[in-house]
Amino acid sequence: MIIEEAQAINSFFRSESSKEVYGLIWLLVPILTLVLGITIGVLVIVWLERKISAGIQRRIGPEYAGPLGILQALADGVKLLFKEDLLPSRGDIRLFSVGPSIAVVSILLSYSVIPFGHHLVLTDLSIGVSLWIAISSIAPIGLLMSGYGSNNKYSFSGGLRAAAQSISYEIPLTPCVLSISLLSNSSSTVDIVEAQSKYGFWGWNLWRQPIGFIVFIISSLAECERLPFDLPEAEEELVAGYQTEYSGIKFGLFYVASYLNLLVSSLFVTILYLGGWNLSIPYIPITELFEKNQTSEVFGTTISLLITLAKAYLFLFIPISTRWTLPRMRMDQLLNLGWKSLLPIALGNLLLTTSSQLVSL
């Protein structure tokens, strides 16, 4: 009798432990899938930028590594992975080593609230866009740590510039996001997309918030440190800015963080202003178009994912083309644009949005 009870207890604990293991596996599956998708997305961005840049400069661009050179970015990443990781002899090794990781991880966390399609979001939080703004302000801390830990005047100046630039353009970005939240009556990224679904192309927040859209684009370009806002790593002034002392995989992490941030900004422009996963046809939401059975739902989810990515990658032509068409700004011009121009415009836009919402009540 006692042996049977002991066997029953052992089988119970085994079943419970197996359930925990399966639960952990199913918890990791969407996270790993998201990381894999993000990695592929970054490789596509690098290839697009090289091809578009080559077209602007009348060159061919990468063409040998894989079909049409699409594997060139992967080859560069593997090369950096096997390069020697040098450390500054008089620098703060802990800050020097942790800085790139903080920059990458903080940007990766932003993807958790991005709805890539219908039912394709890792966590649908009621404070989704607010969480993104809070998380995006962590990355400059990693850059400042990298600059300070390098014990190099160029690196430290680049880190200080990155922190100043991020603060200057994070503040105008926030009123633009608050204006969208007021129009949608929610800070959830999913609710914001669904609020734009009724009228198709004409229901996009782009038409209701044109001022906020322009301010958001400029601020997001500055957050990504893209030309003409690449002052933290200006080659002519600071060698390579906060990246000067880095080599190997740590050096590659900064480039990964830059392209991750660019993809995040493009996806948030798509979600906040361009209707997200919705079609451009009025009164035909994609959620109702493919809800007849399970197969239709899977097909609809795939279509919504493709629509979101198509909008995001089409928007990427703006930051890529500005890299080769606009000159770099001076530091005083950059700060004046953020504090004296964009911030008053963003606050005025928020005031107008609030007033219109109060009048419509």
UniProtKB/Swiss-Prot annotation:
GO cellular component: chloroplast thylakoid membrane
Compartments it resides in: Plastid, Chloroplast thylakoid membrane
EC number: 7.1.1.-
Biological process terms in GO annotation: aerobic respiration; photosynthesis, light reaction
Membrane topology designation: Multi-pass membrane protein
Major localisation: plastid
Superkingdom of origin: Eukaryota
InterPro entries: NADH_UbQ_OxRdtase_su1/FPO, NADH_UbQ_OxRdtase_su1_CS
PANTHER family: NADH DEHYDROGENASE SUBUNIT 1, NADH-UBIQUINONE OXIDOREDUCTASE CHAIN 1
Family: Belongs to the complex I subunit 1 family.
Name of this protein: NAD(P)H-quinone oxidoreductase subunit 1, chloroplastic
Organism for this UniProt entry: Nuphar advena
Gene name tied to this protein: ndhA
